[in-house]
Amino acid sequence: MQTDAKNLTALYLITLNVQRLPKPSPDDLASGEEAAKGLISNLDNFFAADKKPATTNDADWEKAKKDTELLAHTSLGWIALQKKDNDTAEKEVTKVLQSNPNNAQVSYWLGTAIVAEKKPERYSEALWQFARAGSLDQAQGGLNPQAREQIDTYFIHTYNRYHGQDPQGLAQLREQAKAQPFPPAGFKIENVEELKAKNEEEFRKKNPALAMWMNLKQELTGPNGEQYFNNNMKGAEVPGGAEGIQYFKGKLISARPAVRPKELVLAITDPNTPEVTLNLDAPLPGKAEPGTEIEFAGVPTAFIKDAFNITFDVEKKKIAGWPGKEAVPVRRHAAVRKKG
């Protein structure tokens, strides 16, 4: 339909009401867009000083002009969302929030537009907008309780899926977003993959030997475990100084025989699950209690995938932490004869 570009009332009503249509047609959207753009392009003319009613003061006239401009940009943003023109939607609703920060509905639209652009590096910004939309009170431009609850539920679900369960972080984001309409420069929420990588790196730095062992175990229990063992471990000393690691560390499960053993079974990943069997080239002195921490390096010779276990040939000198001592031989003194 053709819109009278000089009729403020007609343009205003079309711009206002297009957002209220439950299922706007392409023609409805086109008319709304034309009307909103007509308002913006004729704004100075519509609100010229010589057109101000005598009963309206200057401040109210200027406010009416600003409100009309905001309505036009709000409508253009909404129309762009319906058309899946997400870049335009983002630009228009950002203009609205820059002029009127307290508008939960528009904050939600901004978050929706950012997500729809499918740029994962910007999802933190979208979460900020969802948090704000679900946190603003009605007196601050928030939505009615039912709509607010729906958006907040969506925010929680989206946050947890992106970042993982973090009640403290979620509550903090709510407070930050409620206080200001846009996140600060450099704002970032780490996603689950980034957090996983970060935690793995921290773990590796604090427990390099255990981290290496867990990586080996992951390879060995994977679909190509046997091939990995034969090509990368069997017959070679492990860990062998790789990444600066000289020894693995485990806890004693059992020793055979109990005294002066030549075979040790150790747990590494957790203290109760046997994972390695050490065959020694010479018996160790004395004995050790289960749970004793043992360090070792050796040559893998066999591997069981299902009930995970690696057998190592180990030189006695490459065992550290063994507390047993050789028994001190009893010295027998000859009997002293008495003089008769």
Regions found by a protein language model. Name each.
Residues 130-183:
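Long, ordered, amphipathic alpha-helical scaffolds
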Residues 167-340:
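OB-fold and OB-like single-stranded nucleic-acid-recognition modules
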Residues 19, 30-44, 118-142, 156:
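TPR/TPR-like (Sel1-like) alpha-helical repeat modules
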Residues 3-24, 38-53, 63-79, 105-113, ...:
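Amphipathic alpha-helical repeat scaffolds of TPR domains
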Residues 1, 39, 95-96, 133:
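Canonical positions in the second alpha-helix
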Residues 118, 126-130, 147, 267-272:
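Mature extracellular/secreted ectodomains of secretory-pathway proteins
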Residues 21-26, 83, 117-120:
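Structural motif corresponding to the intra-repeat A-B loop/turn of tetratricopeptide repeats
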Residues 81-113:
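A contiguous binding-surface segment within folded domains or other stable secondary-structure elements
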